[in-house]
């Protein structure tokens, strides 16, 4: 049974928001106060909302759902791709292409083209082409891979998306809202929580805070797979093995301060 402690969030710097002048008034109910001109997020609320978000992710995956991690900001790029691979899910960590969800058929066409180029590399087709032709195909493939490599094995639209910066990923959020795809997201003091189905108030800039949030989401995916009796594809780990960061943070916060049990 997972635990989510205030201490764990505190040690990750989860409580630091943005400068008070940059806030979104809709976040008022999630703000504890201000210190030196910076909003402090109410971690008593964050820990409960994190638990609720994790439970939703777990239940969705247990029911056979798929998850799309979205994080294109510099601090999140590696975290998002690593967690998606660890859990056998999907990710977008470069620029979000408009229509990735709402124009799925067109995106599928680009993915098919990427797979065609990949196949040509291994079946000997490249050997029959000129150097210029192979270079053109390589460039084309690299461009598509950079944009869509994290979803090239996603056969259908995801059942939920997990977002680490709702301002930067506003197009992804809007597309998900339009299609009725639930959104789980980390929302900082300058964000609008209203379009988010499961908002988790917290710092969306600090590496430790991002690591904690993304790792908790990934652990919930794995828990859902465990409960469904499914193996975790392409992860290289056994079901139930949590991330190193999540394990260390959990140990640091265990038994201290208030905790919420799932």
Curated annotation (Swiss-Prot):
GO CC annotation terms, alphabetical: cytosolic small ribosomal subunit
Region of interest (Disordered), ranges: 234-262
A single GO BP: translation
Record's keyword terms, sorted: Ribonucleoprotein, Ribosomal protein
Pfam families per record: Ribosomal_S2
Claim: Ribonucleoprotein is one of the keywords in the record: yes
Keyword Transcription: no
GO molecular function terms attached to this record: structural constituent of ribosome
CDD domains given in the database record: RPS2
Sequence similarity: Belongs to the universal ribosomal protein uS2 family.
Protein name: Small ribosomal subunit protein uS2
